[in-house]
From Swiss-Prot:
GO terms for molecular function: beta-glucosidase activity. One of its GO terms (biological process) is cellulose catabolic process. InterPro entries: Glyco_hydro_1, Glyco_hydro_1_AS, Glyco_hydro_1_beta-glucosidase, Glyco_hydro_1_N_CS, Glycoside_hydrolase_SF. NCBIfam families: BGL. Belongs to the glycosyl hydrolase 1 family. The gene is abg. It holds the Pfam family Glyco_hydro_1. This is Beta-glucosidase. It comes from Agrobacterium sp. (strain ATCC 21400). The active site is at E171, E359. It comes from the Bacteria. Keywords: Carbohydrate metabolism, Cellulose degradation, Glycosidase, Hydrolase, Polysaccharide degradation. Coiled coil: none annotated. Its EC number is 3.2.1.21. It catalyses: Hydrolysis of terminal, non-reducing beta-D-glucosyl residues with release of beta-D-glucose.
Length: 459
């Protein structure tokens, strides 16, 4: 087993260790205090979308147990908490009246973090779009970007004086391709035009969110969390190398290019540009405002091969076989070196600010035995990937912090409650929390750290 103290010695004294969650995955209380349904509440209730028709009605009951959960973070010695805010609690219809009780909850949560000395890293959007906005087309409609701008301004005006950092969006890739092209996430669309519209409008909403945050809370560092894909070619053959570049443009460039270069990827636009929504003259300038930081979510490599099927849609790739035999319980390949290669590639291609690993973790479904959860494979996963982060720092990359996904087992989207990513086990019948062996190991690593000034430097 990797000794946490040995690993800790490889990180600079101002490196930040945190844990991450998301509103819909943990809060429950979906009808409490004026909250209205999100697209995920509706999606859970539609047959065939979520394992066992599980839903977020109770989840980890964090809405009622937040103090206990913050105490747990403090007891683990973890310095920072990355959480998301539920738009349907704060502006329940997406537009229209602000729900003070929703804001009050996050007031209590943020104040609770501050009282315990926990740094606050808030995410404005982690997929729980107010259902009412689907009446206008949801993210396929430009009006949703304007609704998000008002929501962002509302949140930052209320909480900005107590946040250590804010991200506009978590994983636009999921909210775009997984939700509008592959149909796996809410709203379950399978339509390229809808996906391209969602892509541009989410990118635009990100830009609006940056503007709104800087207008009302100029001291809070603003960033964006992206689940970049490694796009590793199956072979050195020309067809596979070209396929890997197309995959990179589609899965990464669709977001990185507009945000960090002020343009959409050329080959992608050549193939799909005539199906894009209207891109107004000022849009790319709004989208590409300089960020103070960015977050990378990484779990598993993407391996691709050329798909030579006649007429196949861009990016014309298909999955290539895994290289590692090690897989998590959700079936994802474990291959830490891809994280190093991915960060190298992204910093080669883009002028990026400092980086936080905002999610990294593994799904293993061990239960509690004699008051313990022996999840050695998860512990090994963390040790291996944190070793790569230390390598990246050694190699000169501006890695500033690491957030384990997740603090606790939770609602894992289309997989329901059957897949567990937590450092802490949750018994969903009793809501009892049990720190797993991986959580104890992570706690030993994080709590042994100096508690200096770990704020994000403003760009």
């Amino acid at each position: 087993m990797t000794d946490p103290n040995t690993l800790a010695a490889r990180f600079p004294g101002d490196f930040l260790f945190g844990v991450a969650t998301a509103s819909f995955q943990i809060e429950g209380s979906t009808k409490a205090d004026g909250r209205k349904p999100s697209i995920w509440d509706a999606f859970c209730n539609m047959p065939g979308h979520v394992f066992g028709r599980h839903n977020g009605d109770i989840a980890c009951d964090h809405y009622n147990r937040w103090e206990e959960d913050l105490d747990l973070i403090k007891e683990m010695g973890v310095e920072a908490y990355r959480f998301s805010l539920a738009w349907p609690r704060i502006i329940p219809d997406g537009f229209g009246p602000i729900n003070e009780k929703g804001l009050d909850f996050y007031d209590r949560l943020v104040d609770g973090c501050k009282a315990r000395g926990i740094k606050t890293y808030a995410t404005l959007y982690h997929w729980d779009l107010p259902l009412t906005l689907m009446g206008d087309g949801g993210w396929a409609s430009r009006s949703t970007a304007h609704a998000f701008q008002r929501y962002a301004k509302t949140v930052m005006a209320r909480l900005g004086d107590r946040l250590d950092a804010v991200a506009t969006f978590n994983e636009p890739w999921c909210a775009v391709w997984l939700s509008h092209l592959y149909g796996v996430h809410a709203p379950g669309e399978r339509n390229m035009e809808a996906a391209l519209a969602a892509m541009h409008h989410i990118n635009l909403a990100h830009g609006f969110g940056v503007e709104a945050s800087r207008h009302v809370a100029p001291k809070v560092p603003v960033g964006l969390v992206l689940n970049a894909h490694s796009a590793i070619p199956a072979s050195d053959g020309e067809a596979d190398l070209k396929a890997a570049e197309r995959a990179f443009q589609f899965h990464n460039g669709a977001f990185f290019d507009p945000v960090f270069k002020g343009e959409y990827p050329a080959e992608m636009m050549e193939a799909l540009g005539d199906r894009m929504p209207v891109v107004e003259a000022e849009d790319l300038g709004i989208i590409s405002q300089k960020l103070d930081w960015w977050g990378l979510n990484y779990y598993t490599p993407m391996r691709v091969a050329d798909d030579a099927t006649p007429g196949v849609e861009f990016p014309a790739t298909m999955p290539a076989p895994a290289v590692s035999d090690v897989k998590t319980d959700i079936g994802w390949e474990v291959y830490a070196p891809a994280l190093h290669t991915l960060v190298e590639t992204l910093y080669e291609r883009y002028d990026l600010p400092e980086c936080y690993i905002t999610e990294n973790g593994a799904c293993y479904n061990m239960g509690v035995e004699n008051g313990q959860v022996n999840d050695q494979p998860r512990l090994d996963y963390y040790a291996e990937h944190l070793g790569i982060v230390a390598d990246l720092i050694r190699d000169g990359y501006p890695m500033r912090g690491y957030f384990a996904w997740s603090l606790m087992d939770n609602f894992e989207w289309a997989e329901g409650y059957r897949m567990r990513f937590g450092l802490v086990h949750v018994d969903y019948q009793t809501q009892v929390r049990t720190v797993k062996n991986s959580g104890k190991w992570y706690s030993a690593l994080a709590s042994g750290f100096p508690k200096g000034n770990h704020g994000v430097a403003k760009g």
